[in-house]
């Protein structure tokens, strides 16, 4: 089976086409107190149905190093204070921010939260300092069928595609 990975980017916050959630019970909050277990647990819970496998073999030490890294910021999405999803932003030394992981728990998919969650991720990426030159993400054909459309709807532009056999 061929898996296509698509890379998208945005070079200005003005490119963002926002989508808000009208339901006030849906909220997004940064995890100010770092907890690598939160990152690990959400990686498994969100990524299970999308075949996120590369980090399943990580040890607790690897998760701790990743989750506590100063360049990483993690945000949780909540609906009526129930955890609904998350995203991770990782800044590099060149002034680029990657939306490293992004997704909703299965029971919250299809409820109109994805666009609002991605809007928040992109807005928060542009707020990171010092100045940010680019926000980028990659998705693949194993991800949610609407993932690529959501990224493009928010104003992200494809800059590369790669195909690989699984």
Residue ranges and their predicted role:
Residues 91-100, 109, 131-133:
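A conserved beta-turn-beta hairpin within the catalytic core of GNAT-like acetyltransferases
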Residues 76, 82-91, 98-103:
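Conserved beta-strand in the GNAT
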Residues 64-76:
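A short helix-loop-beta-strand connector motif used in the catalytic cores of GNAT acetyltransferases and
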Residues 1-32:
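Acyl-donor-binding surface of acyltransferase catalytic domains
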Residues 20-55:
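Short amphipathic alpha-helix that is part of the acyltransferase structural core
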Residues 3-8, 136-138, 157-166:
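Conserved catalytic-core motifs of GNAT/GCN5-like acyltransferases
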Residues 101-104, 110-127, 148-153:
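Conserved acetyl-CoA-binding loop-helix of GNAT-fold acetyltransferases
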Residues 109, 135-147, 164-166:
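Conserved beta-strand-loop-alpha-helix junction that forms the acyl-donor binding cleft
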């Amino acid at each position: 089976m061929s898996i296509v990975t698509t890379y998208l980017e945005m070079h200005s916050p003005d490119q963002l086409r926002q989508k808000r959630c009208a339901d006030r019970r849906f909220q997004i909050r940064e995890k100010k107190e770092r907890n690598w277990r939160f990152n690990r647990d959400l990686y498994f819970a969100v990524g299970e149905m999308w075949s996120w496998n590369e980090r399943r073999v990580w040890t607790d030490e690897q998760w701790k190093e990743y989750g506590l890294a100063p360049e990483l910021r993690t945000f949780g999405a909540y609906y009526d204070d129930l955890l609904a999803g998350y995203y991770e932003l990782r800044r590099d030394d060149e002034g680029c921010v990657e939306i490293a992981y992004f997704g909703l728990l299965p029971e919250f998919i299809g409820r109109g939260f994805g666009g609002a969650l991605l809007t928040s991720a992109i807005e928060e990426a542009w707020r990171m300092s010092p100045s940010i030159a680019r926000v980028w993400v990659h998705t693949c054909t194993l991800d949610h069928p609407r993932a690529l459309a959501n990224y493009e709807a928010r104003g992200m532009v494809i800059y590369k595609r790669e195909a690989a056999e699984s």
